Amino acid sequence: MELPANVQNQLMQFQQLQQQLQMIMYQKQQFETQLKEMEKAIEEMEKSGSDEVFKMAGGILIKRNKAEVKEELSERVETLQLRVTTFEKQEEKMQKRYTELQENLQKAMGQGQ
């Protein structure tokens, strides 16, 4: 059975959207992982009684002021939170479009039978 051109087009859009949605979800997951790591690092630094901490830079550890490192990490956390929020919004919009396309395809396939 040959599918009509509009159904083939919708099917291609559906497959492309599915791939894009998977990429968005993967990227969001990566940022969420980084965010948790940063938050854990800040938490561990706060437990430390020392005013200095060691920071990894290019494969070596460098002694740094704890307050400066905490500020850097806090800024990074803010950036990551913003990115995660952006990806959540994109994911939500794509998921809605995905569901709409899926329903349209199911209707079109049902009518063709």
UniProtKB/Swiss-Prot annotation:
Disulfide bonds: none annotated. GO terms for cellular component: cytoplasm; prefoldin complex. It comes from the Archaea. Keywords: Chaperone, Cytoplasm. GO terms for molecular function: unfolded protein binding. It is found in: Cytoplasm. GO terms for biological process: protein folding. Its main location: cytoplasm. Pfam families: Prefoldin_2. Molecular chaperone capable of stabilizing a range of proteins. Seems to fulfill an ATP-independent, HSP70-like function in archaeal de novo protein folding. Heterohexamer of two alpha and four beta subunits. Belongs to the prefoldin subunit beta family. This is Prefoldin subunit beta. It comes from Methanococcus maripaludis (strain C7 / ATCC BAA-1331). The lineage of its organism: Archaea, Methanobacteriati, Methanobacteriota, Methanomada group, Methanococci. The gene is pfdB.
